[in-house]
């Protein structure tokens, strides 16, 4: 294997550690089969290196790498090992069937870790690094060494550790910000100085592994790239211990969107980002927050009227990347109390409603009133408002009372007729809906034969509404109606009136389905 790699290459290697460091996030453990499913997605995404686990820690991790090794032939598959002979030997055995194996060994280097965790001197750390990197190279040509807690390590000692690891045969040097402590300026300088000063640095790849404890994982990783890093270790959705790791979707899109600035690319197939993110969410049961960059539900959603108006003119006014480039179908114009009339009118037009100026004004007033009752307004809500407006031209539901006692149900409905008069009727039926429809038929004089009837929920959470859909016949002609309300019985009444009022309007025009009107 040729390990002479130029750090001047314009390609950044994406080392995904979702299946190792990411899985260490509380509650995110995966079975070997789940890891294989995720690894397939990472392969399709174009990840260069997949860290599969920590074979010395469990049989499950050993089984997972074996399963991946039998199936995945393109990406490099890495496993993690402590600087212990037994760990390295176990890892080497786990990699025997892997087409492109990498053995990743690590040892803490900071004074805090040396004193309290390892109880080792500088000299002992250097000796261990040399011995175990050499041992690893005896098994695998591709060896990565990580100086754990590198960003809190004295820089002169970190340079010495790096020199020893390179001399022992490491092909990748990883400098982790293990506890998310550093800043972009600091990590940029650290990489730049080490790459410039360590003998043999031009023969290896330098790698960044940043945690997000201060919310700087992506920023620090980008700064490390500016300092000369040519591998970034990251996870899907940024999952990982404590506050997580550098998020793959964020760093790859930062490099793509700001390509002219960074002048470096990755092999990531970005239109697969969202589906990969959603797969991980399902596998580990950890959803991302709605405002999560790139993959959150609000990443390409716009509610503000000013922003929506700008988006309608030119999407570049408020979006720096296309949703399609990361796997979303399109941008979302979220309708809520901040939305303007132009966005509401556009959405109504998309739903098939062509309104006059006065009608748009009235609908927008009704829309604003609805926004005071719920956070978001869906397409179903807009359609319900349009139905309400339509119903106002005919019979409107004023009130209803339903009682279901014994084998028969009773319904009392009160309607406002087209002239504004009140009409009240009662009926009995084989259940609440049957009684309701009977009372409505008596009140309107419209007889409908019910073919099918169903209700389902529309909307989200507390804003959910019941939608009733029915198919009926009148004079042998089939009609369909829908109604939406917080109450499913009321929604059923509105669906029935939707059809009845349509028939009455057709009667006024003198024709129903090609026949002279006779609604009775």
Curated annotation (Swiss-Prot):
A Gene Ontology term for the protein's cellular component: cytosol
Listed cofactors: Mn(2+)
Record has RNA-binding as a keyword: no
Positions of the UniProt region annotated as Regulatory domain: 396-520
EC number: 2.3.3.13
Group of enzyme by EC: transferase
NCBIfam families cross-referenced by the UniProt entry: leuA_bact, PRK00915.1-3
Native species: Xanthomonas oryzae pv. oryzae (strain KACC10331 / KXO85)
GO annotation terms (biological process): L-leucine biosynthetic process
Boundaries of every Pyruvate carboxyltransferase domain copy: 12-274
Catalytic activity: 3-methyl-2-oxobutanoate + acetyl-CoA + H2O = (2S)-2-isopropylmalate + CoA + H(+)
Pfam families on file: HCS_D2 (PF22617), HMGL-like (PF00682), LeuA_dimer (PF08502)
Keywords linked to the UniProt accession: Amino-acid biosynthesis, Branched-chain amino acid biosynthesis, Cytoplasm, Leucine biosynthesis, Manganese, Metal-binding, Transferase
Any one GO MF annotation of this record: acetyl-CoA C-acetyltransferase activity
Entry's family note: Belongs to the alpha-IPM synthase/homocitrate synthase family. LeuA type 1 subfamily.
Protein name per its UniProtKB record: 2-isopropylmalate synthase
